[in-house]
Structure formats: C-alpha cells, structure tokens
Amino acid sequence: MGKNVVVLGTQWGDEGKGKIVDLLTEQAKYVVRYQGGHNAGHTLVIDGDKTVLHLIPSGILRDNVKCIIGNGVVLAPDALMTEINMLKERGVPVEERLLISEACPLILPFHCALDMAREKARGNKAIGTTGRGIGPAYEDKVSRRGLRVGDLFNAELFAEKLKEVMAYHNFMLTEYYKCEAVDYEETLKDALAIADYLKSMCTDVSELLDQARKAGEPILFEGAQGTLLDIDHGTYPFVTSSNTTAGGVATGSGFGPRHLDYVLGIMKAYTTRVGAGPFPTELENEIGDYLGTKGHEFGATTGRKRRPGWLDIVAMKRAVQINSVSGFCLTKLDVLDGLEEVKICVGYQYPDGTVATTTPLAAEGYEQVTPVLETMPGWSETTFGATSVEQLPQAAMNYIKRLEELLETPIDIISTGPDRNETMILVNPFS
C-alpha cells in the first residue's frame, strides 16, 4: 500500500519545502496543496535551472504526478494563468497534470485592493502581508459571501453574486479607506473569460483522493508558509489567514486525517522570518548579516529581505506537538559553515526571571521574552553538497544529534544545497 505523507514548514516559512517536495514526488502519484494561495513561494532548482511556483504544487515538473489544488486554497485566476503560461513555455503539459477543487474560494481584484488599503491604513502597525488578497478572500469565505471556482460555471448567478459582494467591498474602499472603487464590469469579464478553461481541470478532490488511497497510490500533501504563521497557533496577529499545520490537510482537501501516515517537518538549521512580527532569536548583527547573505535570504514571492536568527527549539517543540511530526528534514546546514560557534535557543526568559520551555499563545507574549541560548562549537569545513553523513564535520554531526535530543524527534533528511541531488535521505517517509 502507498503511504500518505505531509510535508510542511515548522518555522515562519521559507524552510526549503519546495525542493524537498520536488525530491519526494518521485515516489508520489498525487501532490496536493491544501491551504494558502499565491502568497507562498516554492523554489525548485533542478540541474541548476530555477523554477519558482506560488500556487501550483511543486510536483508539476514530474510527468508521473497529478497535482491537485484543494478546497483550502484561495485561488487567484490571474495568478494561476500566469503560472500555467510560464510552465507551458517550458514545455510542461499543465492541463494533463493539474486538477482543481470547485470549492476553492476565488481571489478577485477587490480582495487585493482591500489588502493594500488596510496595510497602508495600519501605518507602522502593518502586519506585513504580501498584498495579494489572501486575508480578505478567506474573510469572505468565513462570512459566507465569498465566490468559489464552481460559481464561475453559472454566469448569470455569478454576475449576481459578484455585484452584491463588490457593492459591499467597494463601499469600504471608497467610504472608509478613501480609495478608488474596483470596476465591476471589468472584474466580471475577466473572471468569466477563463471559466471554461478552469472547468476542464475541476474535479471532486475529496472523492479522487479517497479512491487513490483505496487503490494504494501514494499521496503527498504540500504545505505552504510555516507552523508559526498558522492563523490559530502562530504569533497572532502576525500570521497568515489559513491553517498551515497538519490539521489543515483534512479540512483543506477533504482527506480523512486517520489516513495520514507520516508528517515531515521542514526545519532550517537556523531561523528566518519575513515581514513584521516577534522573533525572539533574531540576530541584528554581523552574524545575522552573514546568515542572510550566505543563505540568500530573500522572499521568493515578495523579494523582501528575511530576518535571520538562531534556531529556536522552544518554537520547534510546539511545531512537533501541533503537527505530530514524525521526522524532520534539516535544510541549509551549509549556511552555518565557517561560524566559530553556533547557538540554539532552549528556553524563553521572562522579565521576572522565570524561564519557559513552551511558547506563548500570541505575539504580545513573544515580545516579552529573551532567548536562553546554548552554545556549541562551529565548524570550518564545508558541508555544501555532502551526500552522506560520513562526509560531515564532527561538529556538524554533533549539532544534528543535539537537535534530535532536544526535539525528541529524528532528523530523517538532511539538505546541503539547493539542488534536489544535494540531499541525504536517512529515512524515506514513503518507505
């Protein structure tokens, strides 16, 4: 029987999920996105050729894989078409490989306008959203006024629903935010123009996945962003608008949670965060600059500079707990090469001197703490491109072993470079 594997980020995103998903899809029949939207950026490097995907699952480059966008994903038709056209120019037969849930909420131009207007109005209290309409689209879903992909297939009813929701949002844009209204006729025309094309790729995702499971076909679920950005369990309100944790698989795809076999947590050997929000181990010094430069820490979606810091075990333990992590994939180990010492956060100290080994439940709590750091010897030798544990310096092996001890969870995969070949699979999640 095939296994059903979840791959998700355990930090604030940008952990290197795209490469690992691409590597593991060699063994999968289906790759499923279950949350987020085109705010995610997954970078794949294959034989030196870089491809950045935002919406379509990372398995799209493999001819043995069907890629699925589940109902938990908010879908921007224009962004989807841009990505499809980019892939088709590279010779990828997207229509043969991509399937979409009719229940995906649509991101339309007024969602993006609202997103940008709100961020501007927040001033120095801005959350740091990508401005791509993700949050407003999820809001419409929860308030039950949102339009879904399936609504496009009845033009008359879609036009009626669109008029109603745009009247509501344009009122907010013009009267509250003092911005221009979004044009209804243009929005309607653009949306309906690709209705038939989208319909050709739509399917009942829950039924398809259940039939695949019963047939013993391996399924890989691809998470976007990271655990600490989860709407419920992250550093609220500096979070995304979806459930980035393993629980989101069931709600975002219609796949039964009892049928998940393995949860692979992707963990960078240090930590980064992009945008605003608390970050206890942030390094605003020359070491932070070193990690940011060597790690090429710029967002794949926005191009924004990421904020680097030491690995935070307190936050990682919460990720293990929430996601039932079976094993970790450690990425960007090579970025630590050349440091005389490396540090790990093992506790949070509060102003009254108490030390906690569990995370707070909101941003305000994180802002009170200072990290309790454990120092380990660094290594001068390179780990870049290593393909076996025996090739690693002893100090790097000691670092990995210490992480496993602290997290009480094995590191089953080690990544030592951006290419899919620069990876050590110690335990195969699909085996």
UniProtKB/Swiss-Prot annotation:
Gene Ontology CC annotations of this record: cytoplasm
Q: In which pathway does it act?
A: Purine metabolism; AMP biosynthesis via de novo pathway; AMP from IMP: step 1/2
Instruction: Name the active site residues.
Output: D14, H42
Needed cofactors, names only, are: Mg(2+)
Which controlled-vocabulary keywords does the entry list? Answer: Cytoplasm, GTP-binding, Ligase, Magnesium, Metal-binding, Nucleotide-binding, Purine biosynthesis
Residues the entry annotates as binding IMP? D14, E15, G16, K17, N39, A40, G41, H42, T130, R144, Q225, T240, R304
Is-annotated flag, keyword Metal-binding?
Answer: yes
Q: Where does Mg(2+) bind?
A: D14, G41
Q: Name one GO biological process term.
A: 'de novo' AMP biosynthetic process
Q: What class of enzyme is it?
A: ligase
PROSITE patterns reported in the protein's UniProt record: ADENYLOSUCCIN_SYN_1, ADENYLOSUCCIN_SYN_2
**Catalytic reaction equation(s):** IMP + L-aspartate + GTP = N(6)-(1,2-dicarboxyethyl)-AMP + GDP + phosphate + 2 H(+)
Q: How many cofactors are bound and how?
A: Binds 1 Mg(2+) ion per subunit.
EC number annotated for this UniProt entry: 6.3.4.4
Highest rank taxon of the organism: Bacteria
* Residues the record lists as binding GTP: 13-19, 41-43, 306, 332-334, 415-417
Q: Which GO terms describe its molecular function?
A: adenylosuccinate synthase activity; GTP binding; magnesium ion binding
Write out the residues that bind substrate. Answer: A300, T301, T302, G303, R304, K305, R306
- List, alphabetically, the CDD domains matched: AdSS (cd03108)
Coiled coil segments of this chain: none
Keyword hit for Magnesium? yes
Where does it live in the cell?
Answer: Cytoplasm
User: What does the sequence similarity comment in the record state about its family?
Assistant: Belongs to the adenylosuccinate synthetase family.
UniProt name for this protein: Adenylosuccinate synthetase
Source organism of the structure? Shewanella piezotolerans (strain WP3 / JCM 13877)
